[in-house]
């Protein structure tokens, strides 16, 4: 008779839910005040002019205008600004 011993239980098989991070509004896009521009962990992007930074480092528009991405400073940091139209 063909017999097989029962397999042990596994401790794998779980994964956390995706957090939907990333850029939500791209360069040149028109935004309204309060619009979320980037959801991020830490400051991959820094807040420039007319951009606020939330408690979880979410960047959002403080005024209406167009999104502008720029690289500034000796450390080549990425800044996001809102340029009034």
Curated annotation (Swiss-Prot):
GO terms for molecular function: structural constituent of ribosome. GO terms for cellular component: cytosolic large ribosomal subunit. Pfam families: Ribosomal_L27. Residues 1-20 are annotated as: Disordered. It comes from the Bacteria. One of its GO terms (biological process) is translation. Keywords: Ribonucleoprotein, Ribosomal protein. Belongs to the bacterial ribosomal protein bL27 family. HAMAP family: Ribosomal_bL27. This is Large ribosomal subunit protein bL27. It comes from Klebsiella pneumoniae subsp. pneumoniae (strain ATCC 700721 / MGH 78578).
């Amino acid at each position: 008779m063909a017999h097989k011993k029962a397999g042990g239980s596994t401790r794998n098989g779980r994964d956390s839910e995706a957090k939907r991070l990333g850029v939500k509004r791209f360069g040149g896009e028109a935004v309204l005040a309060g619009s979320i521009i980037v959801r991020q962990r830490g400051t991959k992007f820094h807040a420039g002019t007319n951009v606020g930074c939330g408690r979880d480092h979410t960047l959002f528009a403080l005024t209406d205008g167009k999104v502008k991405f720029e690289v500034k400073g000796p450390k080549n940091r990425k800044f996001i600004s809102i340029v009034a139209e």
